[in-house]
Structures are given as C-alpha cells and as structure tokens.
From Swiss-Prot:
Pathways per UniProt: Amino-acid biosynthesis; L-proline biosynthesis; L-glutamate 5-semialdehyde from L-glutamate: step 2/2
Organism: Janthinobacterium sp. (strain Marseille)
The name this protein goes by in its record: Gamma-glutamyl phosphate reductase
Location relative to the cell: Cytoplasm
Lineage per the UniProt record: Bacteria, Pseudomonadati, Pseudomonadota, Betaproteobacteria, Burkholderiales
Keyword Cytoplasm: yes
Length: 421
C-alpha cells in the first residue's frame, strides 16, 4: 500500500464530507447518533467477539496491564458508549448559534457565530470507546473526522466504524464524515499529522511517547495533554471520612487513566491520624507508597513502602503506586502542585471555605476540585455527553473537550447599507 497516497485520499474525502456536515441540520445529526446507539446495543455480541480477537493478540504480544484494561470492551463499556451518544443527542446543537451581538456607532451590528472546526484527526491507542465517543461528538458538532486507533484494537475499531458509517448513511449524511484508518502502518500517523490542507486539528489520546512524537513532528495544530500527574491535598480542616473515601477512589478506582491521583499531599498536623487509616485501605489493593522522610516515619510497617525520589513527584505511574508527601501549609501544597503538576486535575479535601476558594484560584490546572475525587475529571461526568479528549493546554480548549471545544467562532456583521467613512 502507498501510505502517502492512501492518506491523501482519506483526507480529500474527509474535507469534502466536512463541507456537507457543516450545513447538516440538527435533526439529521441526532438521527444518525440514535441509529448508531441502537446498532451498538443490537450488535453487542459481534463487538465483544471482535474485541476478544484484539485481547487475545494483545495478551500474546505482552501488552501492559494498564493498556489491556483500556482495550477491554465490557458489557458496561458497550452500554456506556450507547448512552454517551444519547446524551450527545440531548445536548443543544452549538452550530449556528450567534452570541455577543452589539450595535456599533456606525450602525452595523456585530456578533459571533459558532462553526465547526472542519476535519479533526484523532490518534489513540488501545481505547475502542474513543471510536464512538469521538465520532459522536464530531457528528453533533458538524465536523468530519479521521480516526487512527491503535493496532491493538483494530478489529473492534473496524466493527464500530462500520456501525457509525451505516448510521450516517441511514440519516442521509456522508459516510465519509467518519473514516477509520484501515492500516496499522505507523507511517499513516506521520502523514495524518502533516496534512494541514486536509486536517484542521489533531487530537491525540495516548501515552507520553506518542504525544512527544506528535509535538516534535506535527504541522497540524493539536488539542492534547502530555501527562496526568494529579494531586489530592488533605488539609488540616478536612473531614476524615471524606478524605479516606476520596483518596482511595482517586487512586484505586482505575490505575490506567489520566485522572488518577499520582501524588498525595497531607497537612503535617493531621498526617499521623489520616495516613495509617489510608494505609489500611491501600494495603487491600497492594498499593506501593513512595513517601518522603516524614511520611515513611508515620507509615513504618506498611508492607509496600519505598522512598520517594525527586523523579517521583513528576511521574505518572498508571499503576498501583502512589507518592506521598507531608506539607506544612496550604501555601506549600499549592506551590508543590504548581511545580510538579501536569495541570490536569488537582483536588483539596477541606471544610474551610476560604482555603478551598484559595485552592481553586491559585492552582493552575484544567480541573480543580473541592471535596471530590479526581476521577470525576471526565466529559461524561461533566455532562458533556462524552469527551474527545482532555487538554491541559491553555489555548482553544482546556479540560475535558466536548462539543464547544470542537467548534470555533467567526464574526458576523449585519448592516443596512453602511460604508466605512
């Protein structure tokens, strides 16, 4: 296969489809999403069978446990994909919305209209759910998309893409509005990220190695996050039960996600009370605790205890490992977070309103939480219907990227024959 020519043809079809999608009406887009959701439920057995082929190959190839977890398409995951599409249907269509209208002294009226970005290239690894989430959001926001999933999920991605294409066609929309890259050749990624004439933005969802490569090589703008180094700070005004529940969930709910807590900060005055209780919970999951000197002194006897190094504070483990640091004040906690955080998601546990609001204002992250698990940093949980990714950049989109993040604004001007003096 001539990869360059193949990707050029994919890009040309996507660009053509994007023009049709930009003017598609809300009813047709919603109808397509409902067709796809129904097909996912109807074809659940076929999807599980395709996923099983991927899982068998992945296990034989020694795929890491965290990636196997992401690759697995459970009954719950299938149901969640369909529900996510139905949530997107229920959301208002942002396309064509005009806002910020104002009259100018010259007599013209100026406002902004929300429009699609155009063609969105999405690169992801062993996450078949992204195929549906991304397709749904792109359809509703009037964009075309080119999906390049990881080779580990090729069978499942192809099965899902077929259902998406059929749903689009049934609703009278171009099937090429959602295309999956059929080859697992990595050269296809290199072509996709260097086709600005066909692709308007790239959304990568993958490991650090993938993101770093794209940052070096891409000539198409990106919406991305590099790491998910998330913190929870237990303040000395925290409710103990809330702290235990939140910190156990934030670490142990799922290890392989970017919104999992990787560093726990504890106020010195409550550390001797809260850490032993947390250790009992973490021991049930055999979580390795990498503590500073003070934390290790409190945690003596914990069966999975190690010393934290400077590198640990800036490491995304994606595993049953947690770094633990004792801090003397809220100022020290905020300073540590702003120094080592990846600006993804950080949380405080406290009953002190003033401290909580300071934390919200001063922590420079895409999501900042009070008395809630970092695991809530997710488009589905935020009511976005689904998310196409999470951005910890500051330009265009920040945090979970839903419908609005896949649109742009253009200025619109209404006049009555005015000319500029």
């Amino acid at each position: 296969m001539d990869i360059k020519q193949y990707m050029k043809e994919v890009g040309q079809r996507a660009r053509k489809a994007s023009r049709a999608m930009a003017k598609a009406d809300t009813a047709a887009k919603n109808q397509a999403l409902l067709f796809i959701a129904a097909a996912i439920r109807r074809e659940a057995d076929a999807l599980r069978a395709a996923n099983q082929l991927d899982l068998e190959a992945a296990r034989a190839g020694g795929l890491a446990p965290a990636l196997l977890d992401r690759l697995t398409l459970s009954d719950k995951a299938i149901a969640t994909m369909a529900e996510g599409l139905e949530q997107i249907v229920a959301l208002p269509d942002p396309i064509g919305e005009i806002s910020n209208m104002k009259y100018r002294p010259t007599g013209i009226q100026v406002g902004q209209m929300r429009v699609p970005l155009g063609v969105i290239g999405i690169i992801y690894e062993a996450r078949p759910n992204v195929t549906v989430d991304a397709a749904g959001l792109c359809i509703k926001s009037g964009n075309a998309t080119i999906l390049r999933g990881g080779s580990e999920a090729i069978h499942c991605n192809q099965a899902l893409a077929k259902l998406v294409n059929e749903g689009l066609a049934a609703a009278g929309l171009p099937a090429d509005a959602v295309q999956i890259v059929e080859t697992t050749d990595r050269a296809a990624v290199g072509e996709l990220i260097t086709m600005p004439q066909y692709v308007d933005v790239i959304v990568p969802r993958g490991g650090k190695g993938l993101i770093e490569r794209l940052m070096r090589e891409a000539t198409v703008p990106m919406i991305k996050h590099l790491d998910g180094i998330c913190h929870v700070y237990i303040d000395d005004k925290a409710d103990l039960k809330k702290a235990l529940d939140i910190c156990f969930n934030a670490k142990c709910h799922r290890y392989g996600t970017c919104n999992t807590m990787e560093t726990l900060l504890v106020a010195r005055s409550v550390a001797a009370t809260v850490l032993p209780e947390l250790a009992k919970l973490y021991a049930t999951k055999e979580v390795e605790l990498r503590g500073d000197d003070e934390a290790r002194a409190i945690l003596q006897g914990y069966p999975h205890l190690a010393s934290a190094t400077e590198e640990d504070w800036s490491t995304e483990y994606l595993a049953a490992i947690l770094s633990v640091k004792i801090v003397g004040s809220l100022d020290e906690a905020i300073d540590h977070i702003n120094t080592y955080s990846s600006q993804h998601t950080d949380a405080i546990v406290t009953e002190d309103y003033t401290r909580a609001m300071r934390f919200l204002r001063e922590v420079d992250s895409a999501s900042v939480m009070i008395n809630a698990s970092t695991r809530f940093a997710d488009g589905f949980e935020y009511g976005l219907g689904a998310e196409i990714g999470i951005s910890n950049d500051k330009l265009h989109a920040r945090g979970p990227v839903g419908l609005d993040g896949l649109t742009s604004l253009k200025y619109v001007v209404f006049g009555h024959g005015e000319v500029r003096a």
